[in-house]
């Protein structure tokens, strides 16, 4: 039995889209705005180059690839809002921060989705 290569490509693309959706789990915009207004630490997990190219006002840059070794830059006693370019890296960062003991962390998605 042979499978049509087109069907395999479509199935792979659908799996990738589903994975991205499951990984991103972006917080509602109203919740993100509320947390920022209440004084949340806003963390940009994009690369330093991306950050220099434009960032959310007041955000700190802790690239995802060094986040686990730079946790001391993010206070634990305040809410944390994390963003990246699309929401995928920030979703990974949220999981990492929660495993590290951060309680109030949310994924804002991409930079252009912030209030």
Q: Positions of the model-derived regions?
A:
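Conserved small-residue
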Residues: 43-44, 59, 97
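Short loop/helix-cap segments at secondary-structure boundaries that form the rim of catalytic
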Residues: 51-57, 74
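Catalytic cysteine-centered active loop of the rhodanese-like fold, especially the PTP/DSP P-loop
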Residues: 68-114
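Flexible, polar/low-complexity N-terminal or interdomain linker segments that lie immediately upstream
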Residues: 1-41, 45-53
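Short acidic active-site motifs
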Residues: 31-32, 66-70
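Short acidic-hydrophobic, aromatic-tinged amphipathic segments that line or gate anion-handling sites
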Residues: 62-63
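Short secondary-structure boundary/hinge segments and terminal tails
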Residues: 53, 114-115
